[in-house]
Swiss-Prot record:
GO terms for molecular function: ATP binding; metal ion binding; nucleoside diphosphate kinase activity. It comes from Helicobacter pylori (strain G27). Homotetramer. Its EC number is 2.7.4.6. It is found in: Cytoplasm. The keyword Kinase applies. This is Nucleoside diphosphate kinase.
Amino acid sequence: MKQRTLSIIKPDALKKKVVGKIIDRFESNGLEVIAMKRLHLSVKDAENFYAIHRERPFFKDLIEFMVSGPVVVMVLEGKDAVAKNRDLMGATDPKLAQKGTIRADFAESIDANAVHGSDSLENAHNEIAFFFAARDL
């Protein structure tokens, strides 16, 4: 089934200048970039986007990292986009990610792990709406 999902290329990947390589992974695996923008998240936006993690011990570090530099936010579309994106990203901890996944190839740590991807269709819908107006899609 054709779906949409949100992907964020995080500050560490932008610093390494691997944005094009990451986008190529999506496109060469059947995910089309239908909307994209580069931005610098404010603390407030990062806190609101990651509100689900507010009570977790890593929340403060996550917010600091996500506002440490620009990010690229994209809507990906394709067959089973949510699951496909998560497969392409690999495990959250790049040390556990399978060889050939985005995190295994481009991430350094569980904190600086190159990419974010929606973990469910419902969250994809909410995350896309957080960054993109319907008219932009």
